[in-house]
Amino acid sequence: MSFKGNPKVQKVMVQPINLIFRYLQNRSRVQVWLYENISLRIEGHIVGFDEYMNLVLDDAEEVYVKTRQRRNLGRIMLKGDNITLIQNVSPTKD
């Protein structure tokens, strides 16, 4: 008797805090979408975070979506209440 069909593959759930920690460990450049501000994004390297998703970003920049204009901010602390999405923008895949 042969098995036809796909074997059942169990997927492992990735916790959000683990993904943020991986970005921190790999020093990945991330882009943060802001809550209720769709015209502005923040990019930088995560150097710290806490259980409230407050982030400390190094080499942070404001990126204006429409004009692609950038403004250097340096090291900042971004409150978790303002975060809608965090995505990797580093050239290498994590």
Swiss-Prot record:
One of its GO terms (molecular function) is RNA binding. It comes from the Eukaryota. Residues 17-92 form the Sm domain. GO terms for biological process: mRNA splicing, via spliceosome; spliceosomal snRNP assembly. The keyword Nucleus applies. Keywords: Cytoplasm, mRNA processing, mRNA splicing, Nucleus, Ribonucleoprotein, RNA-binding, Spliceosome. The keyword RNA-binding applies. GO terms for cellular component: catalytic step 2 spliceosome; cytosol; nucleus; pICln-Sm protein complex; precatalytic spliceosome; small nuclear ribonucleoprotein complex; spliceosomal complex; U1 snRNP. PANTHER family: SMALL NUCLEAR RIBONUCLEOPROTEIN E. Plays a role in pre-mRNA splicing as a core component of the spliceosomal U1, U2, U4 and U5 small nuclear ribonucleoproteins (snRNPs), the building blocks of the spliceosome. Belongs to the snRNP Sm proteins family. Core component of the spliceosomal U1, U2, U4 and U5 small nuclear ribonucleoproteins (snRNPs), the building blocks of the spliceosome. Interacts with the SMN complex. This is Probable small nuclear ribonucleoprotein E. It comes from Drosophila melanogaster (Fruit fly).
